[in-house]
């Protein structure tokens, strides 16, 4: 096997931790000696052993003189687990091949430096682009302390997310809907608007046994959420946050908040100067709550607000081979729109694939001020 194949194996191992490691990154490690893999591992869950230590624990023979391929710079600080640099040094590994650089200020090059000072050969930025793709959420959250927001919607070939009556079940087929369940498991939070709650009464949970459900966030400026909605009734089972604007703190609003709290719902007031929810303030609050990523499953109004607020980093669009037609049928992004094509929000397509009979397109959002590639481009 080649160096590239060993690192590719480490990348595949890292992906096994998807949905479980947050807010930690996904990391894989492979230990090679005399052209043979003698140990491998990945970070399975936040709070548990890191990839390097799991790889060492799986060793079939001494790692003295071996090379370890790791997708992210080894940590060098004490947290919930001891430093991985210590374990690598103790095993007398002679070479460390690193993919991504760790943006965590507690590491940020210090891990590689400690290894070099111990006489270990360190190769950095090996297959960095491929390794960076594992952890856009981690890189964003560790540097901004705000969630990485992914906007997801399903639409027909003529760009409709619902019929003129508001009906939307189901636009895509079962394979695409199963992928959405996987996405809900992958991200720490899921966010929808009050319009979606009133129209569909969704649970916004994961319906696959053994997968974790995200924290549910509802944007509801005027606190219209029904106390008998599925989301409120299940709030003691799944953490639920309702964000409101607090335009008028009257007795009725106060009573509604108290009743929501009694049912297990958390509330947060994030008003802007227009009496709507300030999504940037909400992201700061959610980041402080330890929520590193959000799957935005909003309607056209919330999607428009999120894009205008600049909080969306990725767009995942599922397109079904159907036509709804109708000027009153709902679209993924509402609002007043733009006047000229040159004013469009620029996206960079990173993946297109077929899922059953449907097509999924993934794009990164480019910064408006930027010329050339997206800031998030890996």
Where are these regions (language model features)?
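Enzymes that bind and transform nitrogen-containing heteroaromatic metabolites
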Residues: 3-8, 13-17, 22-24, 80, ...
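Proteins enriched for Cys/Gly/acidic motifs involved in redox and nucleic-acid/cofactor modification
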Residues: 19-21, 112, 126-154
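Short, conserved alpha-helical segments within structured domains
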Residues: 25-27, 127-130, 298
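Charged/polar positions on well-ordered alpha helices
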Residues: 12, 16, 43, 53-57, ...
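Short beta-strand scaffold segments in enzyme catalytic cores
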Residues: 26-35, 153-154, 361
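Zn2+-dependent cytidine deaminase-like catalytic core
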Residues: 31-130, 215, 246-251, 307
């Amino acid at each position: 096997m080649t160096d590239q194949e060993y690192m590719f194996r480490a990348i595949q191992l890292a992906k096994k931790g998807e949905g479980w490691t947050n807010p930690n990154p996904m990391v894989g490690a492979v230990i090679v000696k005399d052209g043979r893999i003698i140990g491998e591992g990945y970070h399975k869950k936040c709070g548990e052993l890191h990839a390097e230590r799991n790889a060492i624990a799986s060793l079939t023979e001494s790692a003295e003189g071996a090379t370890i391929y790791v997708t992210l710079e080894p940590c060098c600080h004490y947290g919930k687990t001891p430093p991985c640099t210590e374990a690598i040094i103790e095993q007398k590994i002679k070479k460390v091949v690193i993919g991504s650089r760790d943006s965590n200020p507690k590491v940020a090059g210090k891990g590689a430096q400690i290894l070099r000072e111990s006489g270990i050969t360190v190769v950095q930025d090996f297959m960095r682009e491929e390794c960076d793709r594992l952890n856009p959420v981690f890189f964003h959250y560790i540097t901004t302390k705000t969630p990485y927001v992914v906007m997801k919607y399903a639409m027909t070939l003529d760009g409709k997310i619902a019929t003129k009556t508001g009906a939307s079940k189901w636009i895509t087929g079962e394979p695409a809907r199963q992928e959405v369940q996987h996405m809900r498991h992958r991200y720490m939070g899921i966010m929808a608007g009050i319009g979606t709650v009133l129209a569909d009464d969704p649970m916004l949970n994961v319906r696959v046994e053994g997968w974790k459900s995200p924290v549910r966030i509802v944007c509801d400026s005027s606190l219209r959420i029904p106390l008998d909605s599925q989301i409120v009734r299940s709030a003691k089972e799944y953490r639920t946050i309702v964000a409101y604007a607090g335009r008028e703190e009257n007795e009725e609003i106060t009573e509604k908040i108290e009743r929501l709290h009694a049912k297990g719902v958390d509330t947060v007031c994030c008003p802007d100067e227009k009496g709507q929810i300030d999504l940037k303030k909400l992201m700061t609050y959610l980041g402080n709550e330890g929520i590193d990523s959000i799957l935005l499953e909003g309607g056209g109004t919330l999607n428009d607000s999120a894009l205008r607020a600049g909080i969306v980093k990725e767009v995942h669009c599922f397109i079904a081979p159907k036509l709804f037609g109708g000027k009153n049928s709902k679209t993924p992004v509402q609002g007043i729109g733009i006047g000229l094509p040159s004013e469009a929000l620029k996206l960079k397509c990173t993946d297109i694939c077929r899922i059953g009979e449907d097509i999924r397109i993934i794009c990164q959002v480019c910064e408006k001020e930027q010329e050339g590639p997206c800031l998030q481009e890996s």
